């Protein structure tokens, strides 16, 4: 799911990729020629020449407005400004936030002039959810603060209220989203609702569960009653709003909420088991907690390459499969060669597929790295820890590389002409071919063992489906 800015103008994203990039300089490469499109409820600022893309954004924004206005029983009197960018690389160049914006931050909304800023290089379902999320913040600013920024700063509802409500309005949680709350339930670490310090990505998931529980117990009007009482409570005190909306104390709410969570997740845990029941974890260093993502086994099966953030930087490391121990860091010292590695859940939001690929002989790995205005394909010698090739492309937002069995090609997903397709690059000549060239969102390519076909994931009708080309 995408990271977003909170109602206070501060950005709440998973700690794995949030704080690391703040303070870094923002560089503007393009000079966009902005135009304005007026729809019933929006002033939409755009520069794209793709009329179909513009109309899609307009349609999604108006549909999201209709959905939220009915849910909240509230109308916004003036048009909302929506500024959209064709890609995240373009979105990073906005003038609203002075700091560099990492790819883990998907969009943001501001309470000053009720404006939404977002990129649109994603699948249609994700784009609609993103617009729903940011527009929920706009509704919050109007409903809770009455358009009064001073009141919003003074009230300052907890992050979980602002982000949890916006996440809840998006719709169903993913399995990964549920994992955060399930882990808190199993380890008895569910915080009280009056605890203001709940932040990071957990604030999104915790808040989602709170609003889900409200609707489960008090129906759709429960959330509306809570919003009304929170607006009328001095200082945005959640506990007082709970008492007025539901007639129970915050302590009673917490107890019932925890009981509901335990019934939901502990039964699920008994059915599925714990991670340790299925295997031993890979650890870079004993006693140090770190995230490891995009694991891929070497052709021999002796090693696993993965992204890790155990030393602050995000690196590609090798683990020995036999004893699950750290073997070596492949990218240590390469910070000056690129801005960061393209690693889902670490430097960017979750998408699909893996972000590392082994060559058939096991001597090289391929991944994408951010450099200047775009991404480059990096081919790294595993033995010498040296970059063999670094390839710039006209294709943008590349991710999920896959190496062909003969070693001559690398397939990947990338953005070109307003959509994501599967591309293939010749590792010797650098020539690139668009393999799909269709109107759906394509990602996660994988070569068949004989190299004669590629299996990929396409988002069709809101669902991810497998295809072979």
Q: Language-model features: where?
A:
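Juxtacatalytic substrate-recognition/specificity segment
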Residues: 8-158, 175-177, 195, 237, ...
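Beta/coil-rich, acidic/histidine-enriched accessory regions frequently appended to metallopeptidases
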Residues: 11, 15-18, 25-26, 34-36, ...
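Acidic/His/Gly-enriched intrinsically disordered linker/tail segments
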Residues: 100-138, 142-285
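Short coil/turn segments at the loop-to-beta-strand junctions that recur within blades
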Residues: 288-291, 333-338, 393-398, 438-443
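Conserved beta-strand position repeated once per blade in WD40 beta-propeller domains
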Residues: 294, 355, 400-402, 444
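Beta-strand C-termini and the immediately following turn/loop, strongest in propeller blades
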Residues: 305-311, 320, 354-357, 366-372, ...
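Short loop/turn segments that connect beta-strands within beta-propeller blades
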Residues: 320-323, 381-385, 426-430
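Beta-propeller fold detector
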Residues: 326-335, 388-392, 433-436
């Amino acid at each position: 799911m995408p990271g977003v800015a909170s109602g206070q103008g501060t950005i709440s994203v998973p700690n794995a990729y949030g704080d690391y990039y703040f303070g870094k300089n923002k560089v503007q490469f393009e000079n966009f020629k902005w135009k304005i499109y007026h729809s019933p409820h929006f002033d939409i600022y755009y520069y794209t020449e793709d009329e179909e893309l513009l109309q899609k954004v307009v349609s999604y924004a108006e549909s999201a407005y209709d959905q939220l206005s009915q849910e909240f029983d509230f109308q916004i009197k003036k048009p909302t400004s929506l500024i959209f960018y064709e890609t995240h690389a373009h979105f990073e160049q906005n003038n609203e936030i002075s700091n560099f914006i990492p790819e883990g931050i998907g969009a943001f909304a501001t309470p000053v002039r009720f404006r939404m800023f977002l990129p649109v290089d994603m699948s249609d379902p994700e784009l609609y959810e993103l617009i729903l999320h940011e527009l929920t913040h706009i509704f919050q600013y109007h409903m809770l603060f009455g358009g009064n920024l001073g009141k919003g700063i003074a009230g300052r509802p907890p992050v979980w209220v602002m982000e949890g409500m916006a996440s809840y309005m998006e719709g169903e949680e993913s399995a990964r989203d549920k994992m955060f709350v399930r882990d808190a339930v199993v380890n008895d670490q569910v915080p009280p609702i009056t605890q203001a310090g709940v932040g990071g990505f957990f604030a999104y998931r915790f808040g989602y569960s709170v609003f889900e529980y409200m609707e489960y117990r008090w129906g759709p009007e429960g959330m509306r009653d809570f919003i009304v009482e929170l607006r009328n409570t001095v200082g945005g005190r959640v506990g007082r709003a709970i008492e007025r909306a539901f007639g129970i104390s915050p302590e009673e709410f917490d107890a019932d909420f925890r009981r509901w969570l335990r019934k939901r997740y502990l039964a699920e845990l008994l059915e599925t088991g714990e991670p340790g029941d299925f295997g031993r974890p890979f650890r870079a260093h004993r006693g140090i907690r770190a995230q490891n993502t995009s694991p891929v086994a070497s052709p021999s099966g002796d090693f696993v390459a993965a992204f890790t953030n155990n030393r602050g930087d995000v690196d590609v490391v090798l683990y020995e499969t036999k004893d699950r121990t750290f073997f070596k860091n492949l990218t240590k010292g390469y910070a000056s060669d690129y801005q960061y590695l393209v690693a889902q859940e670490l430097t960017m939001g979750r998408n699909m597929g893996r972000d590392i690929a082994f060559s058939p002989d096991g001597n090289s790995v391929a991944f994408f790295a951010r450099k200047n205005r775009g991404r480059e394909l990096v081919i790294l010698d595993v033995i010498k820890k040296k970059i063999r090739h670094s390839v710039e492309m006209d294709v943008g937002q590349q991710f999920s590389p896959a190496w062909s069995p003969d070693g001559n090609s690398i397939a990947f997903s990338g953005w070109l002409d307003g959509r994501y397709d599967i591309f293939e690059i010749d590792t010797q000549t650098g020539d690139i071919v668009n393999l799909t060239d269709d109107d759906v969102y394509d990602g996660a390519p994988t070569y068949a063992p004989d190299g004669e076909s590629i299996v990929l994931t396409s988002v069709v009708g809101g669902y991810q489906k497998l295809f072979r080309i």
